[in-house]
Amino acid sequence: MAGVEKIKERILEEARAQAEANIKRAEEEAAKIIEEAQKEAAAKKAQILEKAKQEAVDVKKRLKAMAELEARKKKLQARQEVVDEAFNKTIEKLNSLPDREYEEIISQMIVNSVESGSEEIILSPKDKQRISPGFIENINKKLSQKGIDGKIKLSEETKNISGGFILKSGDIEINNSFEAIIRMKREEVEAEVIKALF
């Protein structure tokens, strides 16, 4: 019986040793899995943080670029407003010239624009009241001096222009209003105006 007890005890001891070895191996594997999981989590965390940092840098760059673009747009808009104001002031100055001087400028413009000498002149309602009674007669004299048959007429019609005139020949109208002239000349002189203003 004592031999059976010894065998039984030995089997139990081996089973215990085997169980302890299995437990130890399982604990080591669990520790290894936990360590690898922690390393992987740390790597993912670092990756996520790096990605977030890069996205933050990208967002910052985009915001900066947008802000710079907006600032440039506002600067250009402000510059455009100043240039517009300069051209508008030119029209205002022309319109506020003394009547005699204004009439002389318009008269010279008409003489330089006429081709046949039988065109009609259309003015704004304000300018029609502003010109002297001999305005058309003086233009026709100047045309005759240039060798053009001076038969210019002042049209009954008026146009809503701030200054200048419209030259009408049959169905054709040539817009010589200050706005139209400034608009045409603006492209030619705008760069110089910008250089002078800024």
From Swiss-Prot:
Matches recorded under InterPro entries: ATPase_E_C, ATPase_V1_Esu
SUPFAM superfamilies linked to this entry: V-type ATPase subunit E-like
GO biological process, one term: proton motive force-driven plasma membrane ATP synthesis
Keyword Nucleotide-binding assigned: no
Keyword field: ATP synthesis, Hydrogen ion transport, Ion transport, Transport
Domain of life, source organism: Bacteria
Molecular function in Gene Ontology: ATP binding; proton-transporting ATP synthase activity, rotational mechanism; proton-transporting ATPase activity, rotational mechanism
Pfam families for the chain: vATP-synt_E (PF01991)
GO CC annotations, alphabetized: proton-transporting two-sector ATPase complex, catalytic domain
HAMAP family tied to this protein: ATP_synth_E_arch
Function, as annotated: Produces ATP from ADP in the presence of a proton gradient across the membrane.
Similarity comment: Belongs to the V-ATPase E subunit family.
Protein name: V-type ATP synthase subunit E
Source species of the chain: Acetivibrio thermocellus (strain ATCC 27405 / DSM 1237 / JCM 9322 / NBRC 103400 / NCIMB 10682 / NRRL B-4536 / VPI 7372)
Gene: atpE
